[in-house]
């Protein structure tokens, strides 16, 4: 504690140290005075000066070029990563009603109780998982915010978060913000798109605080099994880390019934599951989800959250209850995207791709071609993607994180099944003409 009788000397000492730090690196004359103040975690003095262009910005630029060069050619967009339909009418009508209720005007903080109770009902009905609505559930403003906050509960400088790659990087980004490190677990086809924990060394296990999983996996489409989750639980207990399972795509499971991590014995002792209403309920922009599982971890998340946001708008939470209580909504969405994936797989197989309907998610992840017959060769998936976009007006997302693969999304806009069929026919026409080499 700082002695109250010496505030001036303490302040001067801190200020002088701060000034020395701020002026230790010169800034350019054209820079604003605060260029030297940016935190190292976002680039420090070099913030905003990088010429690096990230993947999705490259895709946006390539799309603009394709539209400019071929204005009369239809752009086939398989790159969109969000649902193409609005939320169910029942949910939208509930939002309109709830927005007019005075009790929804204020801060929701870590409530309200009725949303948590609806989540408890949903988890019991869908997964046979019993949760205490008061202690084992809390809402989040979309799963992204939850994944950004959970590292604050556990990560100190030098700690490790294990993450699957390819995957959603948010928890890893925030791990680094707190001075931690990310250990990448490649998801390779030869391992069935599961991490190979046998390759993790003892020194990594010693420093690991969190393991972040994502099943059904985006973008590979693999789904978890009970045996896999059992292995994870045993490792968590042996090496003493917590498990965060990102279940954003869990309702888009196509092979068997959706499997929650919390259904597996022991899961509740070691971790939490993060759910989202975006994918499975067509509520992408509504930003509503929840964290559930171990009560102590949920409490830690709630404490961090309480210092980061004031809760999602009550009308959104109470409208979401209508979706949670209607099992027909995710069933209809799942049926639609499975149908589209089956059509896409059929189309791509006609063009040389070796692919199958994934276990889950609305993404199809498949090996990128190495080139076209008698023509170009591609060094990686990004080169293939840029070629498809700029030369053939087909937007496909590249993934070079663990092998060279392409990710097709079936969230394209199509008014009906006839429109879906027409789009698939055009896809086959364009790709077959290229004579792709694999």
Language-model segment annotations:
Residues 66, 70, 178, 238-239, ...:
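Helix C-cap/helix->beta junction micro-motif
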Residues 321, 337-345, 355-371, 400-404:
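Conserved glycine-rich beta-strand-loop-beta hairpin in the small C-terminal domain of fold type I
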Residues 17-26, 121, 129, 377, ...:
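PLP-dependent enzyme catalytic core of the Aspartate aminotransferase-like
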């Amino acid at each position: 504690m700082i002695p109250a009788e010496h505030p001036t000397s303490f302040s001067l000492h801190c200020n002088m140290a701060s000034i020395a730090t701020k002026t230790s690196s010169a800034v350019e004359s054209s820079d604003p005075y605060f260029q030297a103040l940016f935190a190292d975690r976002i680039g420090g003095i070099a913030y905003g000066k990088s010429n690096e262009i990230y993947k999705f910005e490259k895709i946006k630029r390539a799309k603009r070029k394709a539209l400019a060069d071929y204005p009369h050619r239809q752009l086939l967009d398989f790159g969109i990563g969000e649902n193409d339909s609005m939320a169910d009418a029942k949910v939208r009508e509930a939002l309109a009603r709830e927005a007019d209720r005075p009790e929804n005007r204020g801060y929701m903080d870590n409530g309200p109780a009725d949303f948590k109770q609806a989540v408890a009902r949903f988890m019991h009905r869908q997964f046979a998982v019993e949760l205490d609505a008061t202690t084992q559930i809390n809402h989040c403003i979309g799963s992204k915010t939850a994944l950004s906050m959970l590292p604050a509960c556990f990560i100190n400088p030098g700690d490790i978060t294990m993450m699957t790659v390819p995957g959603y990087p948010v928890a890893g980004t925030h791990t680094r913000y707190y001075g931690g490190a990310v250990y990448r677990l490649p998801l390779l086809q030869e391992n069935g798109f599961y991490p190979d924990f046998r390759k993790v060394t003892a020194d990594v296990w010693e420093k690991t605080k969190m393991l972040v999983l994502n099943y059904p996996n985006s973008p590979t489409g693999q789904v978890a099994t009970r045996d896999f989750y059992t292995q994870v639980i045993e490792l968590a207990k042996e090496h003493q880390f917590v498990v965060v399972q990102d279940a954003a795509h869990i309702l888009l499971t196509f092979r068997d019934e959706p499997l929650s991590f919390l259904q597996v014995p022991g899961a509740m002792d070691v971790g939490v599951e993060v759910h989202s209403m975006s994918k499975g309920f067509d509520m992408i922009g509504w930003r509503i989800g929840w964290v559930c599982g171990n009560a102590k971890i949920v409490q830690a998340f709630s404490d961090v959250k309480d210092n980061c946001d004031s809760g999602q708008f009550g009308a959104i939470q109470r409208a979401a209850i209508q979706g949670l209580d209607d099992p027909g909504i995710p069933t209809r969405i799942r049926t639609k995207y499975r149908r589209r994936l089956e059509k896409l797989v059929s189309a791509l197989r006609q063009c040389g791709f070796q692919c199958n309907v994934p276990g889950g998610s609305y993404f199809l992840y498949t090996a990128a071609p190495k080139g076209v017959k008698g023509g170009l060769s591609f060094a990686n998936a990004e080169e293939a993607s840029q070629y498809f976009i700029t030369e053939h007006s087909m937007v496909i997302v590249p993934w070079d994180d663990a092998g060279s693969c392409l990710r097709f999304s079936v969230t394209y806009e199509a008014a009906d099944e006839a429109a879906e069929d027409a789009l698939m026919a055009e896809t086959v026409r364009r790709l077959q003409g290229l004579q792709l080499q694999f």
